[in-house]
Amino acid sequence: MSQQETHGFQTEVKQLLHLMIHSLYSNKEIFLRELVSNAADAADKLRYEALTNDNLYEGDGELRVRISADKEKGTVTIEDNGIGMTRDGVIEHLGTIAKSGTADFFKKLSGDESKDSQLIGQFGVGFYSSFIVADRVTVRTRAAGHSADEAVLWESAGEGDFTVETISKQTRGTEITLHLRDDEKEFADDYRLRSIITKYSDHISVPVEMFEAGTPAVEATEDTEAVAATEGSWKPMNKATALWTRNKSDVSDEEYQEFYKHISHDFTDPLLWSHNRVEGKQEYTSLLYIPAKAPWDMWNRDRKHGLKLFVQRVFVMDDAEQFMPSYLRFVQGLIDSNDLPLNVSREILQDNKVTTALRTAVTKRVLGMLEKLAKNDAEKYQSFWTEFGQVLKEGPAEDFANKERIAGLLRFASTHTGEATPNVSLADYIERMQEGQSKIYYIVADSHEAAANSPHLELLRKKGIEVLLMSERIDEWLINHLTEFDGKKLHSVTRGDLELGELEDDDEKEAQEKLQTESEGLVKRVKDSLGDKVSEVKVTTRLTDTPACVVAGEGEMSTQMIKLMQAAGQDVPEPKPTFELNPEHPLVARLNDEQDEQQFAQWSELLLQQALLSEKGSLADPSAFIKLMNQMLLASVK
């Protein structure tokens, strides 16, 4: 026996314990679900490790979880004969939160109990949920393959610290005893525990057992036969079969939902799921879930994602990311293959034909689920899009084979609806295209307001041509990889010519040519005045109400792409913009009449800076712009 050691909880654990006790109080029975789930995982891990080392079973291969209560002592005990933990493992797993992004998680907490409980559920509280109902927790554990004298006793009141000491334990596995708070003694009741197991843990694939007391002998009477005494025994409270191996028709929605909560540690029901068994060239079963809410650490680069992998119903690994592309990293679930070796490793999965085929199949399955949802329940799909739309937008750059299908699932804001809500599909847009229209017009800006109010839309609005309004950071990246849909090119209204084609009649083209001819002198004067600040000056084809605008040339980087790359730390030289003038605007007409070359230069500079500010949202030298504007305002009032 070793001397008892006291360790302090990691700061984040203290915070989590405090939050959990206060935020999850209304859903306190989940402690049993979490602990049974952990115990089942420990059994799965032992089963996998024992594939290459049968001695780990120590002569006992019947894996199970046992739950018991002691009313007098006010305790509940959850015991498993799974993989167990070493002393170092106990300190690591029961004293710290080994998750990247933990600090970010705590920043997201708002103080609103209902919102925070949902976030805490997404975070996954696991073992620490014990302290929702217990004021002291005792853990006795021994790792499989270690001697009886290498067992560990861990104890804590869930406050600042915990104690650890080495003890003797004959059986492998982990035994957790909860010393219930005075107002939580209802859980020290067999009937209450049975009802929770039935509710939350029926899908667990190892038996979850409780002790059933024996019955005394009954002597025979004139009317009845004698009944022999029966001994008490441990009886399973759950079906103890892997849920995904059952027929879909035999699994209820409630069971699917509880299984999702078991594998994801999410407290909320999933949005939808798909359960499929495939036989033939590939033999596998998949159970895939789309969550209702995005995880708090969705954008954390170190976040683990992927499916649980089983081979012939034996658990092999968590977070097998090889089966799901990054743009579908929100998908939860499992895949059970009959074609992979049981000793498969992440390295073997990397370049494996079976893995590639399974990845292709489950990717198509998820896209099919989303297509069906979008078609049959637009409101529910909109809910999905709000949570995961930005992630799905990574798809066209990542998955060339499914680019068109992914594009069909994208949603955008549009001038057609006048709303900021992105609820317009590319198919919707094409359906509303005007006769003679050959392009899908879009604009990318810093915000929805900037996109909707951009001067670049003026002529298109006047002609009733719909424009997709994009304002998320990923949109410029997306649009660089999604250049057409259903045979229609996507065309930026802020780059090059509008290329209206048949949308302009002969009279309009003639008037435009006439305007360009009449403005040749003005265009040359402005270019001479601005010099190399602009690449070109030309008469606009897109403005009706604004005096001037800047556009990127064909093939040049857009303003938004430059911002994106600069934000990523890349040094990007900014190309000179094309400066477009609207000769029919009074300010440009005034400019054309100006004979004083100094005044002309100031007016030209002012219009250029205005156009740059409108396009970029900022200026390289705002002080110089304000000084120029003040000079001109003073001149106008003299």
Curated annotation (Swiss-Prot):
GO molecular function, one term: ATP hydrolysis activity
InterPro entries referenced in this protein's UniProt entry, alphabetically: HATPase_C_sf (IPR036890), Heat_shock_protein_90_CS (IPR019805), HSP90_C (IPR037196), Hsp90_fam (IPR001404), Hsp90_N (IPR020575), Ribosomal_Su5_D2-typ_SF (IPR020568)
Region annotation B: where it falls in the sequence: 347-563
Main location: cytoplasm
UniProt-annotated stretches for the region A: 1-346
Disulfide bonds: none
Compartments, as annotated in UniProt: Cytoplasm
Keywords annotated in UniProt: ATP-binding, Chaperone, Cytoplasm, Nucleotide-binding, Stress response
Positions of transmembrane segments: none
Region (C): 564-638
Listed GO CC annotations: cytoplasm
Similarity field: Belongs to the heat shock protein 90 family.
Function as written in the Swiss-Prot or TrEMBL entry: Molecular chaperone. Has ATPase activity.
Subunit structure: Homodimer.
Name the record gives this protein: Chaperone protein HtpG
Gene: htpG
